[in-house]
Amino acid sequence: MKHFEANFDGLVGPTHNYAGLSFGNVASLNNAAATSNPRAAAKQGLKKAKALADMGMVQGMLAPQERPDLHTLRRIGFSGTDAEILNKAAKEAPALLRACCSASSMWTANAATVSPSADTHDGKLHFTPANLVDKLHRSIEPETTGNILAATFNNSRHFAHHQHLPEHSSFGDEGAANHTRLCKDYGNAGVELFVYGQEATNPAAPKPSKFPARQTLEASQAIARLHQLDDENTVFISQNPDVIDQGVFHNDVIAVGNQNVLFYHEQAFLDTKRKLDEIKRKFGDSELHFIEVPTSRVAIQDAVKSYLFNTQIITLPSGEMAIIAPTNCQENEAVHAYLNEVVTLGSPIKQVNYFDVKQSMQNGGGPACLRLRVAMNDMELAAVNQHTLMNDALFTRLNAWVDKHYRDRLSVDDLADPQVLIESRTALDELTQIMKLGSVYQFQK
């Protein structure tokens, strides 16, 4: 039986815009009110996904959310026809309308936490959608995320789907963006690293003072219980609150791991030495590579601006590892120099490939944000909805779909236009037929 890690990238939705909704995300705030290009954003994401498929990686796509979200606008008191609701919301509560139009579900690293069957007691692949309670525009995603995941991984013999955690700050959960799995091989039981920003039930514990800590220890522990993980397969690590206050809103902005490599900034964690020792002990006797990037080489500001750590580390069919980095890393002198060096350090990382994902980057999401990692075997892959897997035919069909339905310019003011809603629903209805998802959206029910 073959074992491998698949990547399921989020397809950028038709309402991709720059509304500056994400407090604590420097890029999101800095580009607020800029005019976006949804067509270019979607094509950039598809190009990256197809390139990984062409490298021999298993690559899938996850559908975007329905936006504008009229269901939520109705829940908060707006009534009338769809056009009347959009008009009222634009006049009376423009910030709420912007939240209900976000295409942030493209960042599927926040869609869910995934534990592979090699780690779980029941031998199934487990999925728990993130509740994303810290941000209004993302807190309205989990139900539809669960629908899309269930339609993609649609076989109960192999896949276990959980409801998202209770919608309270004590269980603030941001999904795989705060979760990394280390293992010898993808088919072996691994060590799952859960990184959190605060302890909800311990006011004395360290936490940031400027920006919010979006992940709690309590949420991470709950996910580990739901996924039937052993204590010997889990490590809970506190993120350094100082770096959260410098714009490191998720752990995947400051660290990334793959198989036997953990690539992280020296300021990423609290109590680093003790936690690395715990990882080593639980990992076992196999070779393990810790690549620590010192502040003297790459400052936190440069790491955040370039998204050095929001890169993907993938294991190629050859067994070598490659870093998938945004072109922004090439444009930062210190970061580019470090990436040129990292391939010479004697670790499994032997190459760096750069991709233009600037439409996503300007909203605060790099290559790692755009993908949900799913370690699996070939039997589980055969049980996945095959219409969601990237190949030449799907790439061609989705590009044509984007050309047909997506605008090449979208401003925040356009979001109140009823035509945007019509265009988006028409596109998504067709997409569910292309990807054979069934009725996953509210407007289809």
Curated annotation (Swiss-Prot):
The enzyme's E.C. designation: 3.5.3.23
Write the record's keywords in alphabetical order, separated by commas.
Answer: Arginine metabolism, Hydrolase
Residues that bind substrate? 19-28, 110, 137-138, 214, 252, 363
- Active site located where? E174, H250, C369
Molecular function via GO: N-succinylarginine dihydrolase activity
What's the family?
A: Belongs to the succinylarginine dihydrolase family.
**Classification via PANTHER family:** N-SUCCINYLARGININE DIHYDROLASE
Describe its partners and assembly state: Homodimer.
Q: What does this protein do?
A: Catalyzes the hydrolysis of N(2)-succinylarginine into N(2)-succinylornithine, ammonia and CO(2).
Record-given protein name:
N-succinylarginine dihydrolase
| Source organism of the structure | Shewanella sediminis (strain HAW-EB3)
* Designated gene of the protein: astB
